[in-house]
Amino acid sequence: MVAKKIVSLLSGIALAVAGSLLTDIEPPETFGAAKKIAREIHADDPLTFYCGCRYRDNRVDLASCGYQPRKSPQRASRLEWEHVVPAWVIGHQRQCWKKGGREHCTANDPAFAAAEADLHNLVPAIGEVNGDRSNFGFGMLNRKPDQYGRCRMVVDFQARKAMPREEVRGAVARIYLYMHDRYRLRMSPQDRKLYEAWNRQYPVSERERRRNQEVACQMGWGNPYVGEVGLWRCGFGGVMTSLLDGAGGVMQDGLRDALKALQQR
């Protein structure tokens, strides 16, 4: 009976917190603001997306993943924030782009600025890989992944295409499918077929699921191709920690049990 009352109490707290969060959550308005938030989201497990290198602040530990610079050691050691769906893909067909390129779109087209700052589309990347990939699309390539040492990213400059390592192909696909739906981007039947195949072939990882929840707490929504998110969880941990710290004995045990039951709902 007591446990049920505690669960009911926690449910009320969760709904109150969720209601407040739904009002307070505001997606970043600029790419610069989005990059600052992205750094915080990825700080607990800092790995570059395409190569799996560890990094600290803006410096990449190339030895941690056996990365060998292809051409530019200086840029290779620098961390950059990469749009998986390139800004060019998002904006090049818009009127603002035709008038003045990306900068003009950022300053004058709110729809483009929102897509440019979407945290679901931002990943940490080695600067050289980011530059080499440019605005190339993704696809399968018949080439040995040896351009960057043990990093298994492949860039074919002649074909203007890149092939990500297997570990992130599913994530790439789900980001592309999400961005296409969210911002009504054009996608060829061939690309859709590829991304749907990758989505099926490479299931969502726990890391990807966790990131989706964290990003949702900053954006106000998740990537549905990754899975459901609980906005009520955003900031709820801090509330519960305070309650648990202030409780003692049997009450503390009851709160823990009730929280577990609530999280399973």
Predicted segments with their positions:
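Domain-level detector of nuclease and nuclease-like folds
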Residues: 68-80, 85-265
